[in-house]
């Protein structure tokens, strides 16, 4: 495909359609319920024909690169707690789509470039996982951290990658099979605002499309300052081609003002209904 036919997203080395991935898995077994949002397996761990297993893996994606430059600009380590929430919620939200919403075991996989990611960040990431799990327990969502792997892989990771693998076991009768039919009502929940468990306003960006978000929003001043934060094969005109600076204050509402960096880095919200009902307009 010629460059003229490629989108800005494609030219940045990512794919919105994931067509290559879909092609690679097209002949694989789809599990018990082929239309379900996640693959649902028989109860391999318990052997109960009335139960099933769900295992899921995801990461915070390139949002970690954004957190990296925000941390470099502000020295604010707390931004990494949001990244940990992103990596966990990207899993549990997907699992919720098939009905698995409690008693989930998680394991973390962190790959870092030790040259630019110090031990203080690793400590923040590990501690933040425990803090988020405790917060969810207070809202009757039970997550259990089984451990994980932290690897120094500077030859393949430019900054840091934070991923989670999650496992759940539920009755088959609880599975949402995604058998949508005429007459069904689909309710959408806004990702922005402030949920019952959140301490501040959430910009609603989540963890999808961050490659475009950070490059289209943020100023070219970060291009020269942090070459480790982007793919060096990206066309120069698509690297940090926006106008905003990370610490630039944005007037969200009459009484909410947050930096552009904080808005984009707002952690992915948990989409369980009893947690997402807003406490504030």
Say what each PLM segment does:
Residues 276-281:
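A short, hydrophobic C-terminal helix/tail in secreted or cell-surface proteins
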Residues 1-275:
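Helix-biased detector of long, well-ordered alpha-helical tracts
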């Amino acid at each position: 495909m010629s460059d003229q036919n490629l989108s800005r997203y494609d030219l940045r080395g990512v794919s919105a359609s994931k067509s290559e991935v879909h092609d690679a898995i097209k002949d694989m077994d789809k599990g018990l319920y082929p239309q379900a949002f996640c693959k649902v397996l028989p109860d391999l761990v318990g052997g109960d024909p009335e139960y099933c297993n769900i295992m899921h893996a995801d990461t915070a994606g390139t949002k970690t690169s954004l957190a990296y430059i925000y941390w470099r600009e502000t020295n604010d380590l707390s931004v990494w707690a949001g990244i940990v929430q992103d990596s966990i919620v990207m899993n549990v939200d997907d699992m919720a789509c098939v009905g698995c919403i409690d008693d989930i075991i998680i394991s973390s996989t962190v790959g870092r470039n030790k040259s630019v990611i110090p031990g203080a960040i690793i400590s923040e990431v590990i501690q933040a996982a425990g803090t988020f799990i405790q917060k969810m327990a207070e809202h009757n969502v039970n997550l259990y951290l089984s451990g994980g792997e932290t690897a120094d892989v500077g030859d393949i990771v430019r900054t840091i990658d934070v991923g989670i693998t999650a496992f759940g076991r539920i009755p088959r009768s609880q599975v949402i099979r995604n058998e949508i039919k005429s007459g069904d009502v689909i309710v959408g929940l806004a990702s922005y605002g402030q949920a019952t468990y959140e301490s501040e306003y959430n910009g609603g960006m989540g963890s999808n499309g961050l490659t475009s978000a950070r490059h289209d929003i943020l100023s070219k001043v970060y291009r020269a300052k942090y070459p480790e934060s982007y793919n060096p094969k990206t066309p120069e005109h698509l690297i940090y081609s926006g106008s905003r600076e990370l610490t630039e204050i944005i007037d969200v509402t009459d009484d909410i003002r947050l930096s552009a960096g904080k808005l984009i880095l707002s952690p992915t919200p948990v989409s369980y209904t009893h947690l997402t009902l807003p406490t504030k307009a």
